[in-house]
Design a protein with these regions (language model features):
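Short beta-strand/loop motif that positions the catalytic acidic residue
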Residues: 134, 140-142
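Catalytic histidine-centered segment of alpha/beta-hydrolase-like enzymes
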Residues: 172-181
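Conserved acidic catalytic loop of the alpha/beta-hydrolase fold
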Residues: 74-90
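Acidic catalytic loop of the alpha/beta-hydrolase fold
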Residues: 145-149
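Gly/Ala-rich beta-loop-alpha elbow adjacent to hydrolase catalytic centers
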Residues: 95-103
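A conserved short beta-strand
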Residues: 112-123
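The serine-hydrolase catalytic nucleophile loop
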Residues: 30-41
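Conserved alpha/beta-hydrolase
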Residues: 45-63
């Protein structure tokens, strides 16, 4: 279940489980690969999908080698290299916070993906002029009380990305998946059935 791979000379740790279409889980800045295990999403999805959860090189709790990218686009390129190395084709990407932004940048770069799921992504306004280039289905989940990235940003995504589904979790903060794990899992599983 736990593996590591070398990408650009960096050791990247990841969890892997299940069979089926690939789903890639990417944590926020203050978290790690186990975040998705802790809320039960990793094991729940592994019943129907081939699930990967990466310790990204920017996570505070990540046990992967770290690097500071010159831009967030470089993290999207790094993610593409990681997926190519592991032969993960047409994944559904799920990214929270910084990883939500990285997911959006990955999709904007035209890299291979079946769909995207972003949770409270940061820096949405700076991406707005190009968001209409995203052509895959996009699920947007926000905590109503997110004080890091305003839930109003969901309107930007909804108005710029053609095939977007938005859910705002009541009484939840930036890490809404931690505050409301049961509701979050239902939303994600329903979206995956349609993607």
């Amino acid at each position: 279940m736990e593996h590591s791979v070398s990408i650009r000379g960096l050791k990247i740790r990841y969890l892997e489980k299940g069979k089926g279409a690939p789903v890639v889980l990417l944590h926020g800045f203050s978290f790690c690969a186990e975040t998705w295990v802790e809320i039960g999403l990793f094991d729940e999805l592994a019943k129907e999908y081939h699930v990967y959860s990466f310790d990204m090189p920017y996570g505070i709790k990540s046990r992967s080698d770290k690097f500071d990218a010159k831009s967030r686009d470089e993290y999207a390129e790094f993610l593409n290299d990681l997926l190519k190395t592991l032969n993960i084709n047409e994944p559904i990407l799920l990214g929270a916070s910084i990883s939500g932004e990285v997911t959006l940048r990955y999709l904007l770069s035209g890299y291979s993906a079946k769909a995207g799921i972003v949770i409270g992504p940061v820096n949405v306004k700076s991406l707005a002029p190009n968001l209409n280039r995203i052509t895959v289905p996009l699920l947007v989940v926000w905590g109503e009380r997110d004080d890091i990235s305003s839930p109003d940003n969901s309107k930007i995504l909804e108005s710029h990305v053609r095939n977007t589904e938005v859910h705002i979790l009541k009484e939840a903060g930036h890490a809404c998946y931690m505050d409301k794990p049961k509701e979050f899992k239902i939303i994600v599983k329903d979206f995956l059935k349609k993607a």
